[in-house]
Amino acid sequence: MEFQHELIIPNEGLPFKLFLFEGRNGNYVREKHWHTSIEIFTVMEGSLFFYIDEVEYPLKAGEFLIINSNEVHSIQAPVRNETIVLQIPLKQFTDYFTAQRFIRFHSRNVRHREDVYAPVASEPSETDKRMVSLIQDLYRIYLSKETGYEFRIRAVFYEILYLMVSTYRETEVEESELKNSRRLDALSKITTYMREHYREDLKLSGLAAMFGYSDAYLSRMFRKYAKVNFKTYLQDIRMAYAYRELLN
C-alpha cells in the first residue's frame, strides 16, 4: 500500500481545522494519503481533480467534495485555484456512528453513475449551495476574528455538521468499505491517543500493551500505514503542537 497517513491538528481553540488549500498556485500534486478526520474541499475559483479508489472526481468552482475518514485519496491541481479546506475530527460524529464505529458521507453534486461506475456531476441542489455558502461564511468569520467570533464560527460550524448528518450521511455501505476502513481505523485510534497525550512520556511498548498489540506488530503498523516509525511520528506531533504554540 503506497500511501501515507496525514497528521491533522485542529486550529487553536476550535473543534476543526480550516485553511486555504496549499496547491492554490497550480502545478501541484498531493500523493495518496489518508487521515482520520472528515475533510471537505470547497472550490471557490479554478478547479481540482481528486482520485478515490482510482476513480477521478473533477471539482470546479462552486462545488465541494467530502473525503471520508480513512479514505485513501490523492489530489491534482494543474491550474491556479482558491479552495477552502475544512477538516473535522471524527469524534464530532460519535453519536451517529454505526455499531462498527463507522460513518460515511457523500457529496450530492458529485455522484457515481450506477451503470458505468464513473462520477457524474449534477446541478447543485439548494442544500449544496447552502453548504458552499456556509463554508464561505466559516472562512470569512475565521479571517475577521472580530470580537465574539468564536461564538459565530461555532454556530456556522454546527449548521454544517447538521447538514452533513441530515443530508449527506449514507446509511448503507458495502462490507468491503467497512473492512478497508477498519484496517486504518486500528492505527487511527492509536494516533488519536498520541495527539491527546503528546505531553506525556509515550513509549511504543506502553501503547502496544494498551491497545493489545506486540511491540513488533505496532512498529510494523506505523511503517506500513504511516510510512514513518513510531518515534518519528511522535516527534512530528510534538513539533506540530510546539509550532502552533509558538505562533500564539
Question: What are these model-predicted stretches?
Answer:
Residues 1-21, 72-143, 162, 166-171:
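A hydrophobic/aromatic-rich effector-binding and dimerization subdomain
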Residues 18-35:
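Conserved short histidine dyad/triad with adjacent acidic residue
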Residues 33-50:
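Short, conserved beta-strand element in jelly-roll/cupin
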Residues 44, 60-61, 69, 79:
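A cytosolic small-molecule/anion-sensing beta-strand core signal
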Residues 44, 132-146, 191, 195-198, ...:
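Regular secondary-structure segments
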Residues 54-66:
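Short acidic-glycine-tyrosine-enriched beta hairpin
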Residues 189-196, 201-208, 213, 220-248:
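Terminal helix-turn-helix DNA-binding modules in bacterial transcription factors
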